[in-house]
Structures are given as C-alpha cells and as structure tokens.
C-alpha cells in the first residue's frame, strides 16, 4: 500500500544520501593512504606493477565503499523498519583485561584504540550474548577508514570453512564471486604488514568447522605476523587454542550509559523519557542487571514501546518483543496499520512454528543459512504441524518483512540476533517436548559444548525453574557430592 511506498522512498533516500557521503570519504582514504602503501608493496615486483597497483586500488576502493555503507547502518531489534546510523546511536563501550588479570583499568572504545592495539597486536574480545561485540568491531572498522589507521579487512568467521579459508574469503570479498581477487597479490600485501584484520563471531562457527577455522586463524596469523588481529567470541573452550591473543572483556553498562542508549533509540523522545523515569522510580530494582547489557536494554525499549509495561523476566522480554514485531504498527507506523502476513498464521501459530524452527537451528548448530537451507528448516517445522496451512516461501517472506526475526546478508540469511533463536529453542523445550524434556536438558548439560548453551539455559531457568533444578542443578550437586566423598572423606586427597 501507500505506506510501504512511502517507507521504501524514505529508505531509498537514506541509502542514497549515505552513498553520496561514503563515496568521497572512501576515495580519499584509498587515494591518500591505501594506494601509497600498495605502491610500496609492488615496487619490488617485476612485471606489470602499474596494472597490479591500479587493479588492487580499485578492488579495495569498491570493497571499502560497500563495507563502509554496510557497517554504518545498524541492524538492531529496536529499529525494525527505520534506517539508523551506527555512529548516531553508539554508546562507547569499555574494554578491560579478562578476569584473571590484575590490571582492571577500563579502556573506553569510541574509535579505533590505536594505542591498545599497537601494544598487544593480537586481541581477543570475549563476552556473553548481547554485550555488543559485533557493534564494537564495526565501530572500530569505520574509524580505521575515517582516520587512516591501517588497511582493514572484516571477516565474519561463520563464513570460513574447509572449502573457504580466510585468504579465499577475503579474495572473494574483493573480487566478487565470479572474479576472485589474485591471492598472490593479497599475500604480498599482508606480508608487508600494517593491515588490520577484524575476525568477528568465533562462537558462530558451526561446531564441525571449529577445529579447521581455529587452525586456519593460527596459521594465518603466523604467516603474516606484522599485522593487527582482533577477534570476538562468546566464551568458548576452543579459544584456549588461541593462546597468543590477549583477552579482554566488555565492561557492563553503567546505569547512565543504558539511559543514554535508550534516549538515542527515540531521539530523546517521550517513550525513553517515560521509561527512564519508571526505571529511576525505584520500583524496578529487580531488573537492574538487565540494564548492564546493551541487547537487553534494546529489548526493554522495544517491549516498552509496544506495551508501556516493563517485563520483569528475560523470557517475557523476548515474548513482548515478538508480540511487538507481530503487531508491527506500534514500532514503525504510529497508527493502526499492521503488516499483512503472507503465511496467514495468527500470533499463536506463528509462535509455535518459530519455537520448532529455533529448536531445529539449535539441533543443527546453525544460525546462518543459504535460502535452500532455511527453506529446508521451515519445511521440517511445517511437517510437524499438518493442520496449519502455509507455504515455506510465505513464511520466509514474513520472517524477512512482516515479522523480521531474520535478515538477509548478501546470499545468506540469519537470525536478527542469535539470542532470539535461543529464546524460541528454550520455549520449545518447555512447551513442545514434554516427553523428551528431561533427555534434552540432560544432553545440553552433559555436552562438551555447554559453553555454547549458557544463554539458552539461562533463559530456560527463567521459563521453568523446576525443570532446570531437576535436570541441571540436581545432577551437578550429586556429581559434586560424589567427588567430595571419593576424594576427601575417603582420604585419597590427603597427602
């Protein structure tokens, strides 16, 4: 309808303005910084030096133009259909050395932290779901271009696998799928040094690829050591294999920082003012912990914008966000218009299908998909509900537009945020798998990959404390008592 046309025009205008701003900025960066570096790299090479230089400069120019535009637009749950620039809503996050380090001095990241990275060169940023790891990486990437700190490359680690190593992924990004960029030229550039590699989302690598990707990172860093490497992940055991990286954590938001974030979400408007006043009233101290996490602050804004009530439990946050997305007029149009759902599912049936999809993604250990992969997962979910009449293509369309729990990234599709998938999976375990509930929870608890399930189990504890205690707390305490009796009461642990 007319609203969609208006939205598309506004979106197009925003994108056009962004492109007009980015093009000269990137051209200056390439001309004044990148090309002289490349000229230095190629001056010792016999043959078609000039041609290589032009080709390389052009490829990097196109890559930076595309990447700068892409990472400048924030993809967050708070702005379902509104274009927002990352720099406009970014609240500076702070890094501190990981827990086992005595130096607790926080380093505020409002730009690329040159001093920090000159000192450590290889930095690992680990933190739990929703602390803003990817946002932090994008902010630093943009600043490297703004202030000419080096030649940056942004690698999403979930794209790396046995048939697509780091070097190949960069050459594909620079040359396009049909015309890969010359890897020899790249290797020469990387060996020269002064490049900055942003490796984002180690925890999003499918488990069957973890070992390959870990080795690939180590090998890559060893072969081209005179560069800067920044890697992000949720805490995972396999990270021990990257011992030559200095680990940092993201500091929790202070209350004033979370209020600042809320104000930025509606440009100092009435919703944030009302919400902040309620939070300051002292009646909601039980959710103070939620205010420490940028993702939960975002969810709080979305939930409150929709219903003007403050959810007191994490899973109710997510449910209220889902409700807000489903009745999307509250978030984007400001009137009674609701997006048409091509699947024709009502909110309860849509929720039921999403729970199954969330669990299926958990079972397959996937959060990013090709179109065929995602349609296959929807087919699997649909087969479990023969009484529901919808096509997989219709639901996919809804998941990208009407109820955008997924977003498209080039030829790939992914959850808007991994924690949404974990919420639906946790709900599925509680509501839809009564006969297997104990077995599923026990399997998660006994998994070698329990680190990967911490956020899901945290959500599950909120939803079903009794089931959590029975299947996780009780076995943990029993194992502890057994260990204690065998090692201490028997005296075997005594000298």
State where each predicted segment sits.
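P-loop NTPase signaling cores
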Residues: 3, 7, 12-81, 85-87, ...
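Extended helical regulatory/linker subdomains that flank P-loop NTPase cores
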Residues: 79-87, 97-105, 122, 273, ...
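P-loop NTPase catalytic cores that bind/hydrolyze ATP
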Residues: 133, 288-325, 347-365, 418-427, ...
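Short linear capping/connector segments at secondary-structure termini
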Residues: 277-281, 335-340, 441-443
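Extended amphipathic alpha-helical scaffold segments
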Residues: 428, 432-495
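Alpha-helical repeat scaffolds in large eukaryotic proteins
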Residues: 26, 30, 207, 358, ...
């Amino acid at each position: 309808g007319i609203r969609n046309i208006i939205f598309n025009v506004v979106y197009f205008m925003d994108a056009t303005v962004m492109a007009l701003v980015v093009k000269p900025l990137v051209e200056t960066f390439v001309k004044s910084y990148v090309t002289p570096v490349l000229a230095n790299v190629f001056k010792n090479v016999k043959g078609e030096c000039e041609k290589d230089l032009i080709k390389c400069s052009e490829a990097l120019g196109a890559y930076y133009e595309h990447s700068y535009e892409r990472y400048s637009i924030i993809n967050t749950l708070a702005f379902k259909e509104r274009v927002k620039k990352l720099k406009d809503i970014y609240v500076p996050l702070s890094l501190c050395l990981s827990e086992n380090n005595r130096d607790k001095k926080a380093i505020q990241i409002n730009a690329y932290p040159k001093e920090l990275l000159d000192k450590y060169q290889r930095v690992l940023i680990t933190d739990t779901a929703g602390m803003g790891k990817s946002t932090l990486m994008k902010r630093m990437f943009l600043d490297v271009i703004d202030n000419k700190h080096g030649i940056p490359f942004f690698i999403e680690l979930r794209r790396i696998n046995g048939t697509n190593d780091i070097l190949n992924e960069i050459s594909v990004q620079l040359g396009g799928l049909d015309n890969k960029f010359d890897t020899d030229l790249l290797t020469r550039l990387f060996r020269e040094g002064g490049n900055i590699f942003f490796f984002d989302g180690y925890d999003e690598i499918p488990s069957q690829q973890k070992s390959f990707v870990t080795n690939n990172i180590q090998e890559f860093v060893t072969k081209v050591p005179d560069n800067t490497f920044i890697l992000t992940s949720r805490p995972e055991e396999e990270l021990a294999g990257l011992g030559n990286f200095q680990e940092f954590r993201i500091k929790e938001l202070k209350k004033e920082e979370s209020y600042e974030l809320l104000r930025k979400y509606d440009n100092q408007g009435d919703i944030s003012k009302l919400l902040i006043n309620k939070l300051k009233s002292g009646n909601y101290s039980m959710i103070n912990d939620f205010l420490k996490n940028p993702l939960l602050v975002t969810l709080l804004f979305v939930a409150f914008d929709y219903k003007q009530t403050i959810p007191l439990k994490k899973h109710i946050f997510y449910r209220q966000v889902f409700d807000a997305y489903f009745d999307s007029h509250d978030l984007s149009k400001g009137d009674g218009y609701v997006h048409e759902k091509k699947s024709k599912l009502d909110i309860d049936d849509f929720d039921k299908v999403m729970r199954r999809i969330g669990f299926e993604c958990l079972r397959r250990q996937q959060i990013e998909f090709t179109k065929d992969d995602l349609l296959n997962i929807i087919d699997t979910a649909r087969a479990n509900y023969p009484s529901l009449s919808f096509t997989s293509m219709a639901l996919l369309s809804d998941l990208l537009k009407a109820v955008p729990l997924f977003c498209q990234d080039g030829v790939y599709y992914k959850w808007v945020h991994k924690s949404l998938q974990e919420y639906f999976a946790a709900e599925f375990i509680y509501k839809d798998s009564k006969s297997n509930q104990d077995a599923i929870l026990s399997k998660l608890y006994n998994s070698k990959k329990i680190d990967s399930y911490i956020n899901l189990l945290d959500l599950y504890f909120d939803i079903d404390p009794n089931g959590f205690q029975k299947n996780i707390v009780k076995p943990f305490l029993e194992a502890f008592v057994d260990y204690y009796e065998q090692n201490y009461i028997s005296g075997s642990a005594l000298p």
